Amino acid sequence: MTTPVTILHGATVFTAAGGDPFEGSVVVAGDRIANVLTGPSAPSRSGRVIDLHGATLLPGLIDAHVHAAAVRADIQDQHRDLFDSELAVLTARSLTEMLERGFTTVRDAGGADAGYRRLIERGDLAGPRLLVSGRPLTQTGGHGDSRRATESHDFAACPRAQGMTHAVADGPDAVRHAAREELRRGADQIKVMAGGGVMSPTDRLESVQYSLAELSAAVGAAAASGTYVLAHAYTPEAIEVCVAAGVRSIEHGNLLNEPVARLMAQAGTFLVPTLVTYEKLYEQGEELGIPRANLDKLGAIIDAGVNSLRIARGAGVKIGSGSDLLGPMRVHQGREIALQAQALGAAGAIVAATRTNAELLGIDAETGTIEPGKAADLIAVDGDPLADPGLLADPGRLRLVMRAGRTHIDRTG
């Protein structure tokens, strides 16, 4: 059987592998990039030729922090209001929409289970390459413990539901068991809540959650299964404990300071900023039903986000890219790149959302750059996102979206 060949010709190509953009062509054979050619001439190889003049060809985008199952902005109550069947359909739809926004790989940071990954891998669901974390681990009263202060029942007595549920575990043994349980259920990596957050009802944003021993137990369980831990943390105090425990990536990190950034760089710990979620929570949160008590927590972090990137960059921390958007705010997923460009520059922000994220996720041999032999995860954007990264926030600018050689959006003709 002949392998189908597609020639993407005439675009400005930004490989994200190093070097400047250039006019050229990319040859796709089956699900792989077969060749990358410079110059205006179309390659002589036979195959379907797609004219991309006026567009920029990039690696497919990677979002290292999504919550596909956060189908409503007020995630604390969605499991009380939706049947599991409703939530499953809405979660599947959200994954398809991420692919249609140019994200060919996403890491779910809590909520989606391995079933969605299997659906995508089998071809039963159009969606990005998906790595799932299962249920995030949190301590009693920590970020993700959705019980209100007035509720006295044990967390385990809460009705089991899909979506934005968490595993409450206290003490190293319980944390180790909880991590192993999520791995048993198919998690690709483990998510822990190491500090306070915006969306939970009882914890303070500045609180440090989970001890070194507890975090080390989670890291050990993950490492024994050949994977890693990502940790929700805002403050230097919480981040420092995570680094000491061997956590691979810090999610958010808005209040990062220089001494702790240096520790992260020395340890090889990644930072995954999620600037866009704070912008959109501030703009839309109240009208979408998020309680005022939660939104009041934004003050300490919304203006600190870009500065944390500058601190991290100055210290040599590897910076990835996430969105963390909830419910209808997810339409702004691509805006994260423009926000990060304020600190990293446009090219740096695109690299964060492609090559660096691929390295973080351990899939850099497969995707993240435009190089021969890698998966044909590619997007073509009308215009020049290296001059205006805001173009990536508009899915209507996408002329082509290809994942593993399969075309999902084609507006070329």
Model-based region annotation:
Residues A224, Y228, G289-A293, G299-P385:
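His/Asp/Glu-enriched, well-ordered alpha-helical/loop segment
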Residues A55-R122, T140-R147, A213, E237, ...:
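Metal-associated gating/positioning segment near the N- to mid-region
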Residues G10, H65-H67, H232, H252:
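Histidine-centered divalent metal-coordination motifs
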Residues D173-L271, E287-G289, L298-I319, A365:
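Histidine/acidic residue-rich metal-binding segments in metalloenzymes
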Residues R72-Q76, P201, I239-A245, L275-I290, ...:
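Histidine/acidic-residue-rich catalytic or RNA/ligand-binding cores of hydrolases
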